[in-house]
């Protein structure tokens, strides 16, 4: 402004205007430079910043791609690890289930073993009992065989010495021979029926004295063998009364034969429901002891056998 005032004071207007124009252009140029510099500096900085950012972005993208690749690899590794872990867990679960099943099976086998042991003990006990029973059965079988032999011997003796035999039917028929000295083959018989716990005399070849009392005594004592012996004695008495001589001797020898007879007992069953049941069962049991109450319990003696032979000879 001082220049303008100096020019305005001494120069002309033209020069003044030219000077002012130069001054204005100079100022405009300076202001333009200032503006250009003001505008260019931030832009340059912005461009530089943008370039740096672009470079950083590119580098970040490269790093991002690398990170993505690493992430994919990590994911693949994770999948593999998870698969291995899953297989291990599945294997562990299978092992646990197998262990549990094995433990259950062991428990079942333990219970079965205990059960088998108890069954074995029971079987051993039963076998021991069966062996004892078998041993007793063998002993009993031997005794039964001996008893059968004794029974056959007794029956044979009665059949031979007394001509005695039994028939089953409606009741039991007892038949004797070797009673009548004149006719040794003459048969004497009587039939006894047993039913409702009562003995009944159905038939007899001879009308004997005291027969009703004998039947009553039989029902009281249930001693059928004694009744049979008494009946034979009654038959014998009826025949001895017919002999004129030696009747006492014959009676004594016949009594000796009866005394030497092996003891037997009879049990009858006269159920009439079926034809098979019509057959009465006759059981003959050899007594093992000698009794003082009956002479029939005495065993067979040699003298008795000799007497029976003489008796047959006399007849």
UniProtKB/Swiss-Prot annotation:
Residues 57-91 form a coiled coil. GO terms for cellular component: Ndc80 complex. The modification N-acetylmethionine is found at residue 1. Keywords: Acetylation, Cell cycle, Cell division, Centromere, Chromosome, Coiled coil, Mitosis. Residues 261-315 are annotated as: Disordered. One of its GO terms (biological process) is chromosome segregation. CDD domains: RWD_Spc25 (cd23784). It is found in: Chromosome, Centromere. Residues 280-289 have a biased composition (Basic residues). Belongs to the SPC25 family. Acts as a component of the essential kinetochore-associated NDC80 complex, which is required for chromosome segregation and spindle checkpoint activity to ensure proper cell division. This is Kinetochore protein SPC25 homolog. It comes from Arabidopsis thaliana (Mouse-ear cress).
């Amino acid at each position: 402004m001082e220049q303008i005032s100096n020019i305005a004071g001494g120069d002309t207007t033209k020069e003044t205007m030219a000077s002012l124009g130069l001054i204005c252009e100079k100022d405009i140029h300076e202001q333009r430079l200032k503006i250009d510099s003001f505008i260019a500096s931030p832009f340059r900085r912005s461009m530089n910043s943008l370039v740096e950012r672009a470079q950083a972005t590119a580098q970040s993208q490269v790093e991002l791609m690398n990170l993505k690749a690493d992430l994919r690899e990590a994911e693949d590794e994770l999948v593999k690890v998870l698969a291995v872990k899953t297989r291990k867990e599945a294997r562990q679960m299978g092992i646990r289930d197998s262990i549990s099943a094995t433990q259950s099976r062991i428990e079942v086998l333990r219970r079965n073993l205990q059960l088998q042991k108890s069954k074995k003990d029971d079987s051993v006990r039963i076998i021991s009992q069966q062996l004892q029973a078998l041993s007793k059965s063998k002993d009993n079988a031997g005794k039964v065989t001996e008893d059968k032999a004794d029974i056959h011997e007794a029956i044979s003796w009665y059949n031979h010495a007394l001509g005695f035999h039994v028939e089953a039917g409606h009741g039991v028929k007892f038949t004797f021979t070797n009673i009548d000295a004149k006719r040794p083959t003459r048969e004497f018989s009587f039939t006894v029926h047993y039913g409702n716990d009562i003995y009944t005399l159905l038939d007899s070849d001879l009308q004997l004295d005291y027969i009703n009392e004998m039947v009553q005594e039989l029902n009281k004592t249930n001693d059928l063998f004694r009744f049979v012996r008494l009946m034979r004695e009654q038959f014998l008495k009826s025949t001895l009364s017919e002999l004129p001589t030696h009747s006492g001797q014959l009676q004594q020898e016949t009594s000796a034969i009866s005394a030497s007879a092996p003891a037997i007992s009879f049990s009858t069953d006269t159920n009439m429901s079926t034809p098979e049941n019509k057959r009465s069962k006759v059981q003959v049991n050899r007594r093992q002891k000698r009794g003082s109450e009956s002479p029939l319990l005495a065993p067979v003696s040699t003298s008795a056998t000799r007497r029976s032979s003489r008796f047959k000879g006399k007849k």
